[in-house]
Amino acid sequence: MIGNETLAEGLGAVLQYCYEREEIFMVKILFVCHGNICRSPMGEYVLKHMVAQAGVGERFEIDSAAVSREEIGEPVYPPARREMAKHGVSCEGHKARQVTMADYHHFDRIYYMDRSNARYLSRMLPQDPEKIRPLLPRDVADPWYTGDFRQTWEDITEGCRKIMEEFA
């Protein structure tokens, strides 16, 4: 379980208020990392889990993508999948894909994991600091190099909680 029920309840209350007044909106979020097999799918599935726990999953569209083409079509890297499973988060059916200009136009927010991702994105998409932002004020630990999937889980969870706070 991810916890932080207060955030989940707050977000649920705000969205229920809007729903009752027919002020329906959908928040569209895209997570981006280098290969879309570790960090960005962790962001995608952790946030999906959080909004589902809050009972507001239908108000969010959440996806993930890569800046590179290296892992296209690959599932979540097994150690990342195992770390998510420890916390009750499933990532079944995920296949890595590359970010596109259509994603830029479709998503409200695009969260990248580190400065390298930001550099790639700046060459691929228009520069838009309101839309394209770091998930955290620091780089999210890259478990591909560190091997520390627990630390990456903690970083991703911290970032997803901040997203929940922003939309609550």
Question: Regions from the language model: what does each represent?
Answer:
Residues 3, 10-14, 30, 38, ...:
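Generic secretory/membrane-interface signal
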Residues 8, 44, 77, 106, ...:
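Surface-exposed beta-strand edges and their flanking turn/coil or helix-capping segments
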Residues 103, 109, 113-168:
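Phosphate-binding/catalytic loops
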Residues 5, 93, 150, 154:
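Conserved phosphate-coordination/catalytic loops
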Residues 19, 25-105, 165-168:
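Conserved active-site segments centered on acidic
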Residues 1-25:
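N-terminal amphipathic/basic-hydrophobic helices that include classical n-h-c signal peptides
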